[in-house]
Amino acid sequence: MSNTKERTFICIKPDAVQRGLIGKIFERFEQRGYKLVAMKMLKATKSHLEIHYQELQGKPFFNDLVGYMSSGPVIAMVWEGLDVVKQARQMLGATNPLNSMPGTIRGDFSIQTGRNIVHGSDSLPSAEREITHWFKPEELCEWSSATATWVYE
């Protein structure tokens, strides 16, 4: 079983930033009871994104994805909590928003795969790799949430 210190990487994509959805996406994680340990807004470089999406190199959509992700600001975040990698993926919904259930972030706010508003780590090893790629260790804030006793037994 996962522990309450498990971490995942979530990135709000340029389309969601432009559409003013940052707060709505952020709120889903807070309301669920997850703890934010890092967040920053930046315009990612193509080279940074090529490393982030390295497992997709060679796919026909790779260059379009990198171009889109570098077209505007993104919000990079690290969330912490019990089973957060798996639960965050369920909260996001399917990569193709048309296959996402209503109530999921993508099911509620997006229509096309190429503009699916948010990225989330797909496994614990991916989360660890993505967190270290986007954040320096000193950017991760260790803190105790006053609400933790109301979220966890």
Swiss-Prot record:
> EC?
2.7.4.6
Task: Please verify whether the record's keywords include Kinase.
Answer: yes
Superkingdom field: Eukaryota
Q: Which cofactor does it need?
A: Mg(2+)
Kindly list the GO CC terms recorded for this protein: cytoplasm
Q: Where in the cell is it found?
A: Cytoplasm
Catalytic residues (positions): 119
Which of UniProt's keywords are assigned here? ATP-binding, Cytoplasm, Kinase, Magnesium, Metal-binding, Nucleotide metabolism, Nucleotide-binding, Phosphoprotein, Transferase
- Please name the top-level EC class of this enzyme: transferase
GO BP field: CTP biosynthetic process; GTP biosynthetic process; UTP biosynthetic process
Reaction(s) catalysed by this chain, per the record, are: a 2'-deoxyribonucleoside 5'-diphosphate + ATP = a 2'-deoxyribonucleoside 5'-triphosphate + ADP; a ribonucleoside 5'-diphosphate + ATP = a ribonucleoside 5'-triphosphate + ADP
Checking InterPro entries in the record gives: NDK-like_dom, NDK-like_dom_sf, Nucleoside_diP_kinase, Nucleoside_diP_kinase_AS
Q: Which Pfam families match?
A: NDK
GO molecular-function term, one example from the UniProt record: metal ion binding
Q: Write out the residues that bind ATP.
A: 13, 61, 89, 95, 106, 116
Q: How does it assemble?
A: Homohexamer.
Task of the protein: Major role in the synthesis of nucleoside triphosphates other than ATP. The ATP gamma phosphate is transferred to the NDP beta phosphate via a ping-pong mechanism, using a phosphorylated active-site intermediate.
In the record, the note on similarity to other proteins reads: Belongs to the NDK family.
Q: What is this protein called?
A: Nucleoside diphosphate kinase
Q: Which organism is it from?
A: Brugia malayi
The organism's taxonomy opens as: Eukaryota, Metazoa, Ecdysozoa, Nematoda, Chromadorea
This chain is encoded by the gene named: NDK
